[in-house]
Amino acid sequence: MGQLRKIFGKIKVTLPIPHLLELQVDSFKKFLQEGVAPASRADVGLEGVFRSVFPIEDFNKTASLEYVSYDIGEPKYDMDECISKGLTYEAPIRIKVRLVVFDVDEETESRTIRDIKEQDIYFGTVPLMSEQGTFIINGTERVIVNQLQRSPGIIFEHDSGKTHTSRKVLYSCRIIPMRGSWLDFDFDHKDILYVRIDRRRKMPATVLLKAMGLSKQDILDYYYDVEEYQIDRHIVRRKVVENQYRKENAWVDLCLEDGKVIVARDKQITKFGWKKLVRGGVEYIEVDPKSLVGQFAFNDITDPDTGEVIAEAADEITEEIFERIQEVGLKDVKVLHTQGADVSSALRDSMMLDKTTDVESAQIEIYRRLRPSSPPTAEIAANFFENLFRSSDYYDLSSVGRYKLNARLNIETPLELRTLTNEDILTAVKVLCKLKDSHGPADDIDNLGNRRVRPVGELVENQYRIGLVRMERAIKERMSLQEVATLMPHDLINPKPVAAVLKEFFGTSQLSQFMDQTNPLSEVTHKRRLSALGPGGLTRERAGFEVRDVHVSHYGRICPIETPEGPNIGLIVSLTTYSKVNDFGFIESPYRTIKDSTMTDEILYYDATREVGHVVAQANAPIDEKGSFTNPLVTCRLNGDVSMHPREDATLMDISPSQTVSVSAALIPFLEHDDANRALMGSNMQRQAVPLLKTSQPLVGTGMEANVAQDSGSCVLAENDGVIDYVDAERLVVRYDDGVYPDTGGVKHYELQKWHKSNQNSCYGQRPRLPIGTPVKKGDVLADGPGIKDGELALGKNLLVAFMPWCGYNFEDSILISERVVKEDVFTSVHIEEFELVARDTKLGPEEVTRDIPNVSEEMLRNLDECGIIRLGARIAPDDILVGKITPKGETQLTPEEKLLRAIFGDKARDVKNTSLKVPPGIEGTVVDVKVFNRRSGEKDDRTRNIEDFELAKHDMKESKHIESLTNKTRVKIADVVANKQIAQTLMGRKKGEVLAEAGHIITDEILAEVPLKKLGGLFADKETNEAVKQLLAEYDKQIRIIKGIYDVKREKVTEGDDLPPGVIKMVKVYIAVKRKLSVGDKMAGRHGNKGVVSNILPEQDMPFFDNGTPMDIVLNPLGVPSRMNIGQIMETHLGWAALALGQKFAAMLDTGEALGVIRQEIKDTFESEDVYELIDSLDDEEFRLAVNKAREGIVTKTPVFDGATEEEIWDLVGKTGIGDDGKVTLYDGRTGDPFHNRVTVGVMYILKLHHLVDEKIHARSTGPYSLVTQQPLGGKAQFGGQRLGEMEVWALEAYGAAYLLQEFLTVKSDDVTGRVKMYEKIVKGDNFLEAGLPESFNVLVKELMSLGLDVNLLQDEVEETADKK
């Protein structure tokens, strides 16, 4: 049905928003690969884990356990059963393994296969994800939050001069694997390069390079260029090489061959002059003979005659060595190029500190540092070093780590090679040395290119791997202890370690969270959340400001607004609307590509690293029809900096202005006019909005509402095109076109949720939207969920608001509200409370659920049935009995007289005590559901049988509706086949002698409807037609058998009994619907962070009112706006008022009988936009009437974030309403009727009721439980506690000298046990004076002193004596 709506967005968005739960659902699908054939499964997820741990070989290599494939079975219970019975929704896994036994030849050590055994083994269960992205663990819905973690790979950073007192900037580099040892290289203040493995003691970096197999000379060759010198007696010349420029003065005039002087003597050689020399072909220049002194030999310098080593490679050339070189007459000397402008001798200096000489000594040195306790041999050390970085069993960079390493070091190692190579380490050290010598910037660890998301699939995969590794150890031990030849694979494999790890992860991990299920939005945002906390992540205490802060790379990937306000600020964030996570775990944002400064339709996703270097234009840059920029200069982003660029430079363009914010921030209209702090509160508070009894769409929305509602899984969506065949409050039957549900003929039966208790106790119910016979298209909303109206999110209500002070009732953000809101149930919400009673087998006998409870009046039992369980629909109040239960008491020894009396009168009341389930304080409501769970073998009571009969009748009805819909569909198919076909014989009707059609007649649709389907086979003259009809009927029979089979299984489940925990005989769950009306103390909020508490509910007649008598619904304090800077609420107020007034204006025109054509034209003139013209022209008269009638409550407007209605547009619409042009009116005081002095801003604002409800927080105690040790009353609502009178309150009473009051507070009202009893006796007798005793906490103090060895005695007698003397 058409709805009048005005969309203010001007930017056309070509890309639809990806499904909001895509990350969760796809990640788990990839992990499980459930529908994929074992042979074609990719080496990821579960398959990858099995392949990485298997094959498992024993220590002697005589047997090998190999993995073949796995298979996932069907879950035993469906999701609803798991929730109601408190079970985990999981499926069994079976793995196929092969045990290969070898014969080993002792001499040659070659192996021959002796035996192969293959077997299918049950391998425990794995929790399954629901379509909504949740897991059901022990009956509660949980969400695994995606973790945001430092990416494996390599990172170069510096300490900003904070480490050393000299303030010198020290550079370091770290190689982080997915699993294995961390490798750190860092410089100290003396420019020595050290290496640390696993953050142990540091050693010179060259130790590691030597351990890798490099000699001293190899290292120098790799890291340093060679400077060549020619020595001719006292003249020293240096070879001119282009990249060996250094700052120095010319020793002589430097000339070209033609004699032209390039650099005069004693003048500095510039870079330009050096290039001229190179280009002029100058080979050598004469330098200061002393310039060789202080340089380092490139290789060993030897005496050409004797072979004596004058200086070893890397040695410093001193004056003595220089003189020796001249003596022996060496002509050519090679030194390290370390004195250039951008090179240094750091690595050579590190080498000089290195005491190791070869590979062996270096490997032993590393072994000593990492395993200080055990003495090494060369073989052990070599083995240890090999396993450190080069063995895939111990070290795994992961494909992400390899990808990052390749990208940063600019190398091309294949992604499959996931261990460290020599090239990786050598290049890393080279890049680090260049970085230190100021080549390029260090990396930014907070950039999203260096942080990756670990989604559900990966987190579960890691847990599975941990479990399998534990199991692997056990298997190896078993293989070595027993004779493998006699064993079968199932003797070796015990899946318990894996099950234990999974159970622990899903049940207790920091990332496995109880789903926030207050409303559909809170579900969606919880599943899109990213957390930097959790195992392997940060901790709240250690996380600094930089990690929490917004980073330029967050643009379009992580929302800068939505994050918690407390200690977790910035550590828990949300994905933006359009972002995706790629296979490597990096967050990507979509951009449109620009070619030759013209927009193309190509859309590409870029992660933070790939985006570097691109000039990105904003989504709101003006564009002509051809897709070219209209302005010569465009606002663009380049590497995070915003500036103006020529339009030719732009290479990418944002998709949509809302791509920078998350889902809940994108639901705030005029977000661009709100201060960020308030927008944060606004987006967080929408998640706390309680779904209301009656829902209504916001008059001012953003266009995101439909996406959230439909992707949340709370609505029922059409899975294909089709027709609604049946609908009532509890079920929907849809007859789809062919393509879905082929087994049941394309007919789908939807069970609607009713009275479903969410995790936060809100009532989740679904309401059908469309009547029977409505054709539906794929993706249409068939039924609305909680807080959803017409397939769009509707969490609050549109209220008439006035911004004015009113007698101090809106002081400090308080809210004054009209009684109409309470009377008409505008903000009434329903909450479901669940109570559970368990009857167990005790040592003294079984507990019994019964109505026969000792010492309880008939009045208390009035709502219980004969089994002792409360009836459906009963109104209950605190302390009412919900389920009667008696527990056997310990038998006491009876006297013979008592035994006789008991035998005569049958008084068993003393044997049992009343342990019934009662309603706790503060809960009043109606019983909406009762579930009774019995042991499979146990006896069923009447109530259980009634419930079973009711459930069976429901299944019967469902089955009949399902079959009826299938029959209709088959009839339609047959009608198409037999159209215009003659029948071969006369067709008789249902009544006696009634003839429907004579032989030879053509059958009509009316006749066809009268004939049972079974009779249509072989009815026609045409053989082909008969064949086609028979085929359709055969298909119909098969489908009916399948449908009956489905419902038979369901019926069996109803009657089969339940698996209860050991010792439990019966379990009863009672569900109570509590209606919470709006009351003083409830917290309410708008969408702009404007929150407050209801301070007073005023009668309608006392509220401020318009001159036409309409009273306000809500009065807010105008002082709450300027300092908070959330101007969005004012713009929403004005636009909402215009939307309401215009809707009422059009409806009034309809009521006064105005011609429809005139109303159509009026609407077009008012809105002046193409989409409104199209909508008005597409509606026929009846649809148009309905649309205008619906607009009586206001015309829905959509103002997308950063692309919404401008101020001019709002004032334009307000002007067209005819009620003033500045949004202010004169209001009248409801109490006196006088006008207020000033005109008041009024309008319509969307207000939410948050789940901080006063009814759930308020509580009162007269007497109640006491603490065991101190005997003082407990604290808190959950314990039914009292209020604590602390030391400060005591000081206040002391200051006023209120001695008697103080005595009462500190004794009888607190912890004077005997005093309490005496007090009661005195009150009963009517004596009104206080006799206080000793507080119990004083005794506790005395006992504590005794524990310290101090004996404390109270001197009562002496005190009395002294009093007597006085």
Swiss-Prot record:
One MF term in the entry's GO annotations: DNA-directed RNA polymerase activity
This enzyme's EC code(s): 2.7.7.6
Keyword Transcription: yes
Reactions accelerated catalytically: RNA(n) + a ribonucleoside 5'-triphosphate = RNA(n+1) + diphosphate
UniProt-listed Pfam families: RNA_pol_Rpb2_1, RNA_pol_Rpb2_2, RNA_pol_Rpb2_3, RNA_pol_Rpb2_45, RNA_pol_Rpb2_6, RNA_pol_Rpb2_7
Keyword line: DNA-directed RNA polymerase, Nucleotidyltransferase, Transcription, Transferase
Top EC category: transferase
Function: DNA-dependent RNA polymerase catalyzes the transcription of DNA into RNA using the four ribonucleoside triphosphates as substrates.
Record's subunit section: The RNAP catalytic core consists of 2 alpha, 1 beta, 1 beta' and 1 omega subunit. When a sigma factor is associated with the core the holoenzyme is formed, which can initiate transcription.
Protein's name according to its UniProt entry: DNA-directed RNA polymerase subunit beta
Organism: Maridesulfovibrio salexigens (strain ATCC 14822 / DSM 2638 / NCIMB 8403 / VKM B-1763) (Desulfovibrio salexigens)
Taxonomic path: Bacteria, Pseudomonadati, Thermodesulfobacteriota, Desulfovibrionia, Desulfovibrionales
Gene name per UniProt: rpoB
